[in-house]
Amino acid sequence: MPLLHTLNTALAVGLLGARYYPEVQTFLGLPDYVGHMKNVVRSVFQGSGLVVVSSDTVGVRGTYSNRGQIGSSLGCILAVPDSGADIEIDLDRLVGTEEEATSCLVEAVGSTADVPRRRVRQKGRFAMHAVNAAKLHFCGVPKPTEANRLAVSKWLVQYCKERHVVDSHIRTIVNTALPRVFTPDAEDIQVVLDLHSVRAHDHRNALAEAGKVRKWWVNLAMHPMTGRSWSRAWRRLCRLPDDQAISFVRXGCLRELVGRETQISRGENPAMRVFPLANPPKVRRIFHICGMGNGLDFGVHNNSLNNLRRGLMERVFYVEDAQKQLKPAPQPIPGIFGKLSGIRRRLVRLAGNHTPVPREKYPSFYKGRRATIYQKALDSLHDRPVSRKDAELKTFVKAEKINFTAKKDPAPRVIQPRDPRYNIEVGKYLKPYEHHLYRAIDAMWGGPTVLKGYDVGELGNIMSNTWDKFRKTCAIGFDMKRFDQHVSVDALRWEHSVYNAGFNCPELAQLLTWQLTNKGVGRASDGFIKYQVDGCRMSGDVNTALGNCLLACSITKYLMKGIKCKLINNGDDCVLFFEADEVDRVRERLHHWIDFGFQCIAEEPQYELEKVEFCQMSPIFDGEGWVMVRNPRVSLSKDSYSTTQWANEKDAARWLAAIGECGLAIAGGVPVLQSYYSCLKRNFGPLAGDYKKKMQDVSFDSGFYRLSKNGMRGSKDVSQDARFSFYRGFGYTPDEQEALEEYYDNLQLLCEWDPTGYKEELSDRWILNEFPTTL
């Protein structure tokens, strides 16, 4: 038997060699079976001898076995087809279209009298298509890392599910295709051979040589009889500049860009009175470090009369309908807020009764320039008490980074603050009460709900714990279309009733009524607008954040009555977690936000935690715990822009180094982002001096900075778990992550102003902007 086994094994090797090499067929004396041998798919050794399985020769398909003796002619090995119908598929061969792979069915062959016909789906062809698609998605053969293995496996499973393959077949296909994705085929090998061919090396060397400039003395020695050589030598002796190779600045310089003017006019409202002035509009500036982002176009709106008028029309007085026509904001059903009375009583009980803090303490709630402003307002209150005029609005166009790539000409946002004197009198009640009410909302929902004041690690773990509370979790993110604009008088009255119940103070009640009807003046350098509006949330009010959270959490609690769910909230940004079989009920109930006067915009349901987006962040597992990570497709460009003025190169370096410091505090150990922020800190930290003072400036205050204040992550090694989770969340493959990190780790940035006509070149843009196949 050992000898028989050895002979059969040798025959198997010979027959497989004959499949690929005609010379082997001739050597084995098989000229009559060349057609058969070219199409032999697989040979399998069984106890009865060598079995050559599934020849694809035209007109002949089936299983062939060596029913003859070993010493007989090799021609006896290829006997007539058996009556069995064993079908094997060649996974090495490239097949036709994907439709052929998924729909092609073959019939069992053999003796049709003995074996009934049956149809077998060719999973092998489909698996080969999956291999090819995976290599295209992962840009060739992935590196053999654990993160890539998990990413490829996940991608293959989703590839099969999108094509409605049953689970039992998915497992077979994935197990078959996975190792082949990591195994280079002939084309993969040929690419490497071409890159390292003699011809390729010669061309690269020639290109490098063409870009060199010989030293002047070398040039003189090689060409002593030319005037050009002696001219160079003379210039060097006179300490004049020598010839240099040309170089192009590709990344890293500083740019100053002017503010934008809207090109859309929406007319005026009867409640507006416009007063143009002869002065030109004041042009704002936005500053940018080139070479760091993915080419998104960020800008800032000027505080001009043109922008102010459109901002008031579209963000205060009117909303757009489905036909892009302006109409008044929808009003709530009369009496609808009365249905929230039970929720109000519960929140008041949980928050408890409170008294105001002394007004002298209010400036201490702020730092820097804001503390100074409130101290001056406090001093004036000693001379004269607060009045209705102090509640009037002083409106201007907000100076913020606008993504003009996402929307070419959006309506400018306006800030509508009241006098600091009014804010002190209201704030002495509501500022300390704010956190008590947030914790009451948490208690009402049965866990952390209003996610303010947490760092990114705490936020990520809250998201993970909330996700784990359900058997099969589904999450839907939703927010309100221009929430502030849709806050009606009825909504404000219900919100104020919660505060009044907690304090039972006539002074507070009187101050809050001044928010129901609002008068204001919007000022720009080239004109001003006087206007009046009923209701609406004013963005500068002390209770803006508190009131929005209170309304969003309370209305959602009412709408989801009877459904087991959990909410996380930050103002009008909400995510609801629940059992997947409740998705239809949840989506239907979200439509009833319109009953309260709000237009709810619900996102698509998500069934993977990394796909859940909250405040433009997604939870990513870094190998130790969950952390909220900002969307790199937006943040990598947004963080390279500044609305804070860069007076000179050192001022720019301070700002950029501070961004790097803050970024590492919230993104240490996160793929791509850690290298991005390290690049800023490495390039500009040595030039900036004491850049941490820049973080204390009121102009540096932002959601990004507030997140970083509690962050203590710092630089650390990126784990394979983090790479896989980052891939699931944002679609960048582990190899793409490493390519981006290599780009940022080696990027040298210039702290110089850009040359005239400079166009930013981004060699990493194709990776950052690539939107992969849905996972």
UniProtKB/Swiss-Prot annotation:
GO terms for molecular function: nucleotide binding; RNA binding; RNA-directed RNA polymerase activity. GO terms for biological process: viral RNA genome replication. It catalyses: RNA(n) + a ribonucleoside 5'-triphosphate = RNA(n+1) + diphosphate. Residues 473-586 form the RdRp catalytic domain. PROSITE patterns: RDRP_SSRNA_POS. It holds the Pfam family RdRP_3. Its EC number is 2.7.7.48. Changing residue 42 to Q: In strain: Infectious clone UK. Coiled coil: none annotated. Changing residue 56 to S: In strain: Infectious clone UK. It is an enzyme of class 2 (transferase). Keywords: Nucleotide-binding, Nucleotidyltransferase, RNA suppression of termination, RNA-directed RNA polymerase, Transferase, Viral RNA replication. CDD domains: Betacarmovirus_RdRp. Changing residue 581 to E: In strain: Infectious clone UK. Readthrough of the terminator UAG occurs at position 251. RNA-dependent RNA polymerase that plays an essential role in the virus replication. This is RNA-directed RNA polymerase. It comes from Turnip crinkle virus (TCV).
